[in-house]
Amino acid sequence: MIHSLFLINCSGDIFLEKHWKSVVSQSVCDYFFEAQEKAIDVENVPPVISTPLHYLISIYRDKIFFVSVIQTEVPPLFVIEFLHRVADTFQDYFGECSETAIKDNVVIVYELLEEMLDNGFPLATESNILKELIKPPTILRSVVNSITGSSNVGDTLPTGQLSNIPWRRAGVKYTNNEAYFDVIEEIDAIIDKSGSTVFAEIQGVIDSCIKLSGMPDLSLSFMNPRLLDDVSFHPCIRFKRWESERVLSFIPPDGNFRLISYRVSSQNLVAIPVYVKHLISFKENSSSGRFDVTIGPKQNMGKTVEGVVMTVHMPKAVLNMNLTATQGSYTFDPVTKVLAWDVGKITPQKLPNLKGIVNLQSGAPKPEENPSLNIQFKIQQLAISGLKVNRLDMYGEKYKPFKGVKYITKAGKFQVRT
């Protein structure tokens, strides 16, 4: 299926390649580079590119393109999911999926790729199995390996490989047994100039950190599970129980993993946590314009909006901007015409405001349209959809674990039109 894999950084350098069947020349990536040049940004690079002899299927993660080379037709989503699993495995092993981390652990990277694909077909993709096959890097292990010449590859078959629960290794023991869940939601929204919501959607995930001894059987229930759409499950979840009772029943993997991802697409369920008052105007036959923006939290949220950053791609005719910020700091790049305002935390008592004069190039015509405002923010201990965990029950073991749930709401693609 997958003949080769190329890892390419943002500069267009191929810094790692792996071949399973026959060696494919790096020149095949020229088709990818052509598509990359035509794309406006990295998100617009086509995930599937057809060439005379191959198909190139790629993903973009953490400033790295994972480009796979296929010679026969396969379901593209199957390959894309596998590439995401590769990136997740690197993240799990090295703490980050970056070019530096991959280069620093290049031997382990090749060992992982050799185990994850067998002759080009996915074989072992579960983190627990891989960690028994190939030990994660540590400073001590790296020193020992360099002295003895040994590798990180284990010499025994993983205990979960032949089990009907392949995602969990046997004989797990912890002094402190704990189960923590992070409910993380990203809100994508488009707000028109009058403040009305044109589009709103929530993308959510539940990330888990499970450190429980033995073979625990968990049940996680919610206050309002019916609001979830398009739920994607980890293989450990019993789907029939979810269908009938809307309860997540599962024997968890050991360590960190993504339990589910979901979407809330009903617009009446999506609460917009911030509002923006704006006045951006340009006059005919004038070399200046006016810029005035205020950001505030919606009164019904009850939580602090923090980490607020506003980014504006100003028209090409803008020469510079003389602004005053009542809170935070701003920068304007005269080359890229990007205005960035780092607001920080919003307090309802004193709303942050940015206003001043926009200077245009002399003789330049009035900009045809006003720019859009892109807002980033974060709200701790709030799931904007209203999703709440009801309880976590454990069966099969007699100890009492520590349990905790954390909620985070973040802005995804949050745009305000002016």
UniProtKB/Swiss-Prot annotation:
This is AP-3 complex subunit mu-1. It is found in: Golgi apparatus; Cytoplasmic vesicle membrane. Residues 176-417 form the MHD domain. One of its GO terms (cellular component) is Golgi apparatus. The AP-3 complex associates with the BLOC-1 complex. Belongs to the adaptor complexes medium subunit family. GO terms for biological process: anterograde axonal transport; anterograde synaptic vesicle transport; endocytosis; intracellular protein transport. It holds the Pfam family Clat_adaptor_s. CDD domains: AP-3_Mu3A_Cterm (cd09260), AP3_Mu_N (cd14837). It is a peripheral membrane protein. Part of the AP-3 complex, an adaptor-related complex which is not clathrin-associated. The complex is associated with the Golgi region as well as more peripheral structures. It facilitates the budding of vesicles from the Golgi membrane and may be directly involved in trafficking to lysosomes. In concert with the BLOC-1 complex, AP-3 is required to target cargos into vesicles assembled at cell bodies for delivery into neurites and nerve terminals. The gene is AP3M1. It comes from Gallus gallus. Keywords: Cytoplasmic vesicle, Golgi apparatus, Membrane, Protein transport, Transport. The keyword Membrane applies.
